[in-house]
Amino acid sequence: MTQWIAGEWVEGLGEEFTSLSPYDNQVVWRGKGATAEQVEMAVKAARQAFVGWKKLSVAEREAMVLAFAEQVKENSEEIAQVIAKETGKPLWETRTEAAAMAGKIAISIRAYHERTGESQKEAAGNQIVLRHRPLGVMAVFGPYNFPGHLPNGHIVPALLAGNTVVFKPSEQTPWTGELAMKLWQAAGLPQGVINLVQGGKETGIALAESKGIDGLLFTGSANTGHLLHRQFAGQPGKMLALEMGGNNPMVITDHYGDLDATVYTIIQSAFISAGQRCTCARRLYIPLGEKGDALITRLVEATKKLRVDQPFAEPAPFMGPQISEAAANFILAAQANLQSLGGESLIEAKAGEAAFVTPGIIDVTNIAELPDEEYFGPLLQVVRYQTLEQAVELANDTRFGLSAGLVSTDDGEWQYFVDHIRAGIVNRNRQLTGASGDAPFGGPGASGNLRPSAYYAADYCAYPMASMEGEETLLPATLSPGVEL
């Protein structure tokens, strides 16, 4: 039983698909996808549930969400184990994701009260009231890199605001999506408030095309996000929130401070989660000269020693495999293409068993037309530069704008960087992959439109209703010109 529709677990009627553990290619989940007809059943179930769900008080909806939070906490180790088996991420990392699932719920609740809710004031004898109302049925598309944590940042704010949800996990991580829905079920969520549809591309197309949804919340690749944007063209009545990827630059200056601390910050930025975070550093700008040379030498030495292994290995690895062999082959093909364009590998990424790829670093300084692509994996491009102004200009030469970072102890360099860089997340002397759940998450350009973090998700899960109110109608002492009573 792979689909959860109207509170019932039912078998999919579409094509069979499987989830393979990327570190050994073992099948960890098997089922059939939802057909277009089943997707419509899920949307209709969500529409029917919306009538009662939106009428509940905020306190009642919040209590249901908190019950889910307790389920997450009680089952955190199972969540971590499932995510590790399905994504290949090290167990230490998936345990942090399980904890973040619960932590993001508290942020979402606070955000609802601070950014939405109801407020009123008096002006010129009128009560000016601001209320917020749910949009209706929200489709949520989840990614594979954080299959528990990131969908939660959409689903919880949507439910708190009074919406109902149809959730489609990534076809790479159906097991995690199924487990999350079973925890909602255990929390006592009324039937139809969340509906789960599993499947691949065809299931996703059917959900996005459904006339019964009022909005779509998406985290995933830029290519899929752009397809959704075109699909929603001419439908201003539907809300579309896109959080996509980035070709993220990290600039190091001669004033980088401690050498090992800088190397560690780069490694955390480029290779954590095997490079499968949308905020990972893809382009590393290092100054020409002795200090830059020393940094590269140390970075190469440290990267060669990174432990790459299956998630349950002892001692624990720093990173695991790519999500699939296809994803691994994409990284190797990208490396080969950059080499053919004139790039020089400082460390060559190499294929291992199943979906494993070792970290790669390639100097692309001599490539005249550097491809503006997101290489979603452990492949770091190095560019040598002469001036900070040149580095920032090169860093901004991308259609993306998700994250960027500067490593420098010089306040003047930081001020120049933060004034001229184009990105939604800009860090100083911290890893690019570090982001706060109560800060906006997203960026301009091809990286998306809205800010789908837990805190700012409240902004697009409800619409504001402005009212001017009085207890009775009023007749002014002086009527408007041309009016006689």
Curated annotation (Swiss-Prot):
Residues binding NAD(+) are 220-225
GO MF annotation list: succinylglutamate-semialdehyde dehydrogenase activity
Give the record's pathway.
Amino-acid degradation; L-arginine degradation via AST pathway; L-glutamate and succinate from L-arginine: step 4/5
**Which reactions fall under this protein's catalytic activity?**
N-succinyl-L-glutamate 5-semialdehyde + NAD(+) + H2O = N-succinyl-L-glutamate + NADH + 2 H(+)
Keywords of the record, alphabetical order, are:
Arginine metabolism, NAD, Oxidoreductase
UniProt-listed InterPro entries: Ald_DH/histidinol_DH, Ald_DH_C, Ald_DH_CS_CYS, Ald_DH_CS_GLU, Ald_DH_N, Aldehyde_DH_dom, SuccinylGlu_semiald_DH_AstD
Q: In the UniProt entry, which residues are flagged as the active site?
A: 243, 278
The superkingdom of the source organism is Bacteria
What are the recorded Gene Ontology BP terms?
arginine catabolic process to glutamate; arginine catabolic process to succinate
What Enzyme Commission number(s) does the record list for this chain?
1.2.1.71
According to the record, the signal peptide region is none
What is one Pfam family matched by this protein?
A: Aldedh
Q: What family is this protein classified in?
A: Belongs to the aldehyde dehydrogenase family. AstD subfamily.
- What's its job? Catalyzes the NAD-dependent reduction of succinylglutamate semialdehyde into succinylglutamate.
Stored HAMAP family? Aldedh_AstD (MF_01174)
Task: Write the protein's name.
Answer: N-succinylglutamate 5-semialdehyde dehydrogenase
Which organism was this protein described from?
A: Vibrio vulnificus (strain YJ016)
